[in-house]
Amino acid sequence: MKNFDIAIIGGGPAGYNAAANASSNGLQVVLFEHTALGGVCLNEGCIPTKTLLHSANLLDEIREAKAFGIEVEGAITPHYAAIAARKDKVVQTLTSGVAYKLKGAGVTVIQETARLSGEEGDRILVTAGEETYSVSFVLLATGSSTIIPPIPGLDKVNYWTSREALAAKTLPEDVTIIGGGVIGIEFAGIYSSLGVPVRVIEMAPEILGAMDRETSAMLRKEYGRRGVKFYLETKVTAVSEEGVTIETKDGKSELLPTRQILLSVGRRPETEALGLETLSIATNRSAVVVNAYMQTSHPRVYAAGDITGFSLLAHTAIREGEVAINHIIGGEDDPMRYDAIPSVAYTHPEIAGVGATEEQLRSEGRYYRTLKLPM
């Protein structure tokens, strides 16, 4: 049995930053990650989508160059295989950077799936492969997984999630995106700029439900001018090889023929097979319950990142990991706060927010002022 001060399960933004932080504060750290270091953000989310988006935005700027006094001659042709290859190179470079950071910090990295397996006195046991590790503290940072909704026929078609969309080396002939949140709308922008016909189906009255309603509506209209078709307050009732069957808000049913379906209805905390039951760690709808110091119902087990279900953003995860390590080492009183977390949709144009939206303040009956600056 190997001994460490802290075991961190998960090598995403919460995990790897917390590992380096803990090591710099004198703790002996072991980090477990069964796939690539960097988590969803680096491998299947923030970084690859923004890399593709940069190519798409650059293409838009070239097309608009004449308005800025620049003549571009000849055909303007995106080569998606080359765009995807650049994306892969960026991800590989940054993943290597995470490994280098952890090695430099003296963190022991184990490429295995790990789970909680019990206690011995004041030590927590973590099992990975054939090995068991004895530690004083654990930080759970296993992230989240894509929600697959129970849509009839879904198991009989070759649908994509963001993972498959990012792994593709060719563009789809057309795409129907189920879900109008940040991930879905970012893909809508990428595909429309690259010439792919796009539909977006959203159950809510507006896209980007967590953002300011007026801003979201303005973005939807801009994307509409670019050819993206939106179906709001619309439910997907079935999918097949022929396409997507929808039910509109007035009860009408319609088949939308499509070549590719992209599911983007959200993510859920990844807690399965983690062994939470061995230490009676409390959960709420699969999210690990924590206090303001990221401490779970077990005093020596902490959690950070998407697994807590609060704010599925990389910078939130990093801060949560920081709060957890600070509490473990007995640092200054510095609890986690969620009232001023910035969020961004990397659309074209980008939109961002911080704090409560106007809709939230209105629903809570709180006083607020709105200021608008035409640009």
For each feature predicted by the language model, list its residue ranges.
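Glycine-rich dinucleotide-binding loop and its adjacent helix/turn
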Residues: C46, T142-V196, I201, K229-F230, ...
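A Rossmann-like FAD-binding core segment of flavoenzymes
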Residues: E73, T108-Q111, R115-T127, L194-A292
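FAD-site-proximal beta/loop scaffold in flavoenzymes
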Residues: D155-L171, L255-G330
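Glycine-rich flavin
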Residues: K2-F4, A20-L27, F32-E173, A204-L208, ...
